[in-house]
């Protein structure tokens, strides 16, 4: 029988080998093992640690796999502010910046004027905190002073070392020594495209940065691990020698196991900076990840401290952002889409063109007036522009390339979906289809909005299924969803008994959503998520909201006369009483959880923290109950906290609350206040 010491030695060897191959694959892009052989190593380590839990270490590669469900991300304070950089689109302003640095440093008698030019990665900024070489916390930038603790998700990113590389020098730590590393979390272009391919059209991410941001805030770390994120480091503090040059720090980061992107240059003058910018203006297209500019910063870290920072940005660095990417392509056709509120939107169908890291085949033309202003015709060569995260748009027509015989697209006078004559309300730019109850496109849009993630979050209900349900007359409004039968669903295309049951289960689960979510899901014009929350606070039920006068609605925070009129008009529509009755019969939340002030104001002005496990509420729903009664929910305990609700196995938050002498109540007492 193999002894525990031999197994411990094998586990240590496996951990070392796996981390080395991880680094070769994710950081150096020089893999030595096939995926199969790598998986064999990892599987063996997983087996050892499962059979002998005492062999598990905090920095084991098995801790990256994920599996933790996190219902909230507590707010944490950064060791030092994560400031944003001043930015410019002008090379001339970069020259002025360098000149200003030279003058300031000369006035201070500082020696050395070298700068470092490095690529500006278009990702999500995070901070990693290491204590005694071990990763103990990872946080988002947040507002620059406080961010969300997303350690559990960042641990799944293979290019983030769980333990700093072993070597003598600035990283060598005494007991309790903390080192902070900052950088960007990215999603490679090919991983972004693969992720979007798995998502329905209406739920696709606009760009890799949005996909990365959304991924990092997922509650299930297993899904984060599946999305192949990547980390690039650009800053480190907490070294023994804080006076190192920036280029030396980048090399230290590489030695410690981080990727720095390897795309930086020590520059001795503005000419070298401009050469770097010009090279990467074109060269960045070939990179596997998105970049949107170049950061120029002083190389001497002592000069960083000498020049300091404004309240928003450091004085020793600037970000040069490349001008918007442009491309020319053929405009194949112009189609007219109908939105859930009946808005008619012209959309340009384009010959697919690659621009700023993505392929563009469609672009909105916004409205008929914009179409006329551009003068676009099917068959034109057009200029497409994309700047940063902005959705690509048509900005001009190449009139000199217009073929003879083209003609303008005839503007519709009737709805493209149902044929109803279009109307243009006085004072508005857009045209609308007024056939709200009979237009299939509007019905589909309203049902999809009702089912969306931020509304009722109905699982297993996608666009293609909604299209079938509406086309067959099975669903005429969101209320009809709750009266669908398994046998009729199972007979639909690409369904079956299992899919039908899954949808019905999703509908059943959606009945647990809050009144505020339901109000948002109803799709009342101008009523967004925040407005729906304010309405749910002010009005205890759908009936109270219906009876509220124009003047009463106008007095609700964030609701002016335009929104008040929109709410009143919505209740006057002939189909609304029937919809409300269906939702009532289906058992949906047509009232706040407790009668409100219109609910009681026991939490009015209170800052509330939940800690420990609640038995009758989840954190999200409990928080909504507090907000509906005028309170504010936060995740950290401070002197400003007004109330702490302590559930089972409450930990450090409860202890801190006691030390601060804060008011602490049980879940039973919380329920009594509702």
From Swiss-Prot:
NAD(+) binds at residues 35-39, 84-85, 118, 141, 184, 297, 321. GO terms for biological process: DNA repair; DNA replication. Its EC number is 6.5.1.2. Zn(2+) binds at residues 415, 418, 433, 439. GO terms for cellular component: cytosol. It catalyses: NAD(+) + (deoxyribonucleotide)n-3'-hydroxyl + 5'-phospho-(deoxyribonucleotide)m = (deoxyribonucleotide)n+m + AMP + beta-nicotinamide D-nucleotide. GO terms for molecular function: DNA binding; DNA ligase (NAD+) activity; metal ion binding. SMART domains: BRCT, HhH1, LIGANc. This is DNA ligase. The gene is ligA.
């Amino acid at each position: 029988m193999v002894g525990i010491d031999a197994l411990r030695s094998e586990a240590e060897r496996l951990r070392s080998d796996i981390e080395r191959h991880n680094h070769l694959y994710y950081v150096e892009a020089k893999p030595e093992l096939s995926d199969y052989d790598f998986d064999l190593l990892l599987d063996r380590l997983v087996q050892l640690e499962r059979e002998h839990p005492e062999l598990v270490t905090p920095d084991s590669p098995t801790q990256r796999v994920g599996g933790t469900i996190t219902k909230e991300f507590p707010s944490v304070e950064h060791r030092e502010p994560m400031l944003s950089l001043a930015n410019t689109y002008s090379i001339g302003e970069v020259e002025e910046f360098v000149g200003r640095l030279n003058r300031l440093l000369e006035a201070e008698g500082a020696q050395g004027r070298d700068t470092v030019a490095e690529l500006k990665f278009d990702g999500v900024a995070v901070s990693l905190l290491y204590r005694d070489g071990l990763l103990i916390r990872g946080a988002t930038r947040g507002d620059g002073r406080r961010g969300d603790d997303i350690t559990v998700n960042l641990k799944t990113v293979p290019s983030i070392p769980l333990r700093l590389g072993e070597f003598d020098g600035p990283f060598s730590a005494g007991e309790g020594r903390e080192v902070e590393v900052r950088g960007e979390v990215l999603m490679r272009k090919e991983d972004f495209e693969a992720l979007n391919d798995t998502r329905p059209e209406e739920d696709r991410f606009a760009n890799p940065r949005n996909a990365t941001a959304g991924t990092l805030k997922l509650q299930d770390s297993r899904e984060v691990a599946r999305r192949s994120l990547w980390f690039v480091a650009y800053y480190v503090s907490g070294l023994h020698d804080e006076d190192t040059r920036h280029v030396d720090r980048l090399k230290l980061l590489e030695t410690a196991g981080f990727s720095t992107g390897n795309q930086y240059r020590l520059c001795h003058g503005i000419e070298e900076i401009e050469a770097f910018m010009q090279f990467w203006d074109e060269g960045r297209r070939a990179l596997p990840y998105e970049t949107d500019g170049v950061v120029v910063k002083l190389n001497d870290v002592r000069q960083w401290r000498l020049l300091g920072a404004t309240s928003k940005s450091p004085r020793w660095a600037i970000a040069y952002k490349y001008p918007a990417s442009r491309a020319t392509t053929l405009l194949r056709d112009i189609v007219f889409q109908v939105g859930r509120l009946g808005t008619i939107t012209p959309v340009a169908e384009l010959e697919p063109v690659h621009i700023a890291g993505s392929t563009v085949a469609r672009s909105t033309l916004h409205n008929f007036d914009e179409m006329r202003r551009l003068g676009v015709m099917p068959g034109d060569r057009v200029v497409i522009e994309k700047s940063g995260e902005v959705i690509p748009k048509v900005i001009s027509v190449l009139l000199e390339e217009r073929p003879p015989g083209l003609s303008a697209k005839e503007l519709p006078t009737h709805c493209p979906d149902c044929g109803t004559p279009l109307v243009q309300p006085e004072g508005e730019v857009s045209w609308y289809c007024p056939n709200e109850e009979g237009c299939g496109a509007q019905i589909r849009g309203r049902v999809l909005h009702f089912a969306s993630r931020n509304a009722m979050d109905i699982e297993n209900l996608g666009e293609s299924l909604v299209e079938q349900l509406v086309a067959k007359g099975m669903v005429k409004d969101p209320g009809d969803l709750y009266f669908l039968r398994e046998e009729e669903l199972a007979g639909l295309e690409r369904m079956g008994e299992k899919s039908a049951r899954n949808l019905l289960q999703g509908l059943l689960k959606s009945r647990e959503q809050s009144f505020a979510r339901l109000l948002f899901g109803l799709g009342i014009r101008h009523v967004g998520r925040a407005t729906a929350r304010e309405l749910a606070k002010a009005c205890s039920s759908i009936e109270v909201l219906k009876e509220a006068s124009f003047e009463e609605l106008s007095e609700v925070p964030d609701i002016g006369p335009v929104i008040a009129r929109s709410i009143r008009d919505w209740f006057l529509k002939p189909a609304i009483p029937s919809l409300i009755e269906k939702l009532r019969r289906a058992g949906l939340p047509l009232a706040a959880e407790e009668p409100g002030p219109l609910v009681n104001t026991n939490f009015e002005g209170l800052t509330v923290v939940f800690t420990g496990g609640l038995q009758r509420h989840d954190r999200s729903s409990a928080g909504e109950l507090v907000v509906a009664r005028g309170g504010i929910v936060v995740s950290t305990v401070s002197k400003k906290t007004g109330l702490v609700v302590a559930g089972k196995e409450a930990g450090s938050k409860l202890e801190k609350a006691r030390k601060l002498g804060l008011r602490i109540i049980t879940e039973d007492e919380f329920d009594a206040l509702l």
